[in-house]
Design a protein with these regions (language model features):
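Gly/Pro-rich, tryptophan- and cysteine-flecked surface segments typical
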Residues: 1-235
Length: 235
């Protein structure tokens, strides 16, 4: 099917000027439309190109419903990085969203509340500012069964403001893949490496390994890491 891309969509479609921030709602005649967005930083003079993060268009079936919590991991606040958490209300009713901030040991640091009106959205910048240096995560939840919303995290490099999108997760018994990892040179002097953050969202301790799957080869018998453990609620 046909695709269409809108560059700098807030200016192209809505004629907005700086400083405009918010969310977009996609309304279509059928359910067959899919979408993707990229929000990016353009450094002065663009000598270094752009730094940005992608966010997919979230379907109604992927929104967070009711009181079941979701976890946003891989958040940090220190001299190198900062973390933001944003939420959007997908319904015509007000919603109160609780954001329980925890450190990597699972200890509760603070619970903040985000109140959103119908179809409203907001973002808490540098959510762990008062607890730096810290690595942690945020559990988002609502107190009403009628709640219908979505939250995301964003980790930014303090030197470049290069952001990384972090989507909310729930534990699953399914096999889990991290579909890309790198330790390799790129174009124009770039060099890519991969950080991984793992979290135990269950009620019992667990052990795990990571398996290395090199690109373009048969990985039926992959190289395995040593075994690690995570206590219940830790990350």
């Amino acid at each position: 099917g046909e695709s269409e891309r809108f560059e700098n969509v807030l200016t192209e479609l809505f004629g907005l000027e700086p400083d405009a921030v918010g969310a977009l709602r996609l309304v279509a005649s059928t359910g067959s439309v899919i979408g993707m967005s990229r929000t990016y930083n353009s450094p002065d003079g663009k000598a270094a190109g752009t730094f940005g993060q992608g966010l997919p268009a979230i379907r109604s079936s992927e929104m967070i419903s009711g009181t079941e919590p979701r976890r946003i991991i891989f958040l940090s606040e220190d001299s190198d990085s900062r973390a933001n958490v944003g939420c959007v209300n997908g319904s015509s009713e007000d919603v109160q969203i609780s954001l329980a901030m925890r450190n990597a040991r699972g200890e509760l640091l603070e619970t903040r509340t985000m109140a959103l009106g119908p179809y409203s959205n907001n973002q808490i910048n540098r959510i762990f500012r008062d607890y730096q240096p810290v690595k942690g995560y945020v559990d988002v939840s609502a107190g009403s069964q009628s709640a219908f919303y979505y939250c995301y995290g964003s980790m930014l490099d303090n030197a470049t403001s290069d952001p990384t999108t972090i989507l909310p997760q729930v534990p699953s018994a399914d096999t889990t893949f991290i579909p890309a990892a790198a330790l390799a040179a790129g174009l124009a002097g770039a060099f890519f490496s991969t950080d991984v953050d793992l979290n135990n969202a269950g009620a019992t301790s667990l052990t795990y390994r990571l398996l290395w799957l090199p690109r373009g080869v048969d990985n039926s018998n992959p190289v395995q890491s040593q075994q690690f453990s995570l206590a219940a609620g830790a990350g």
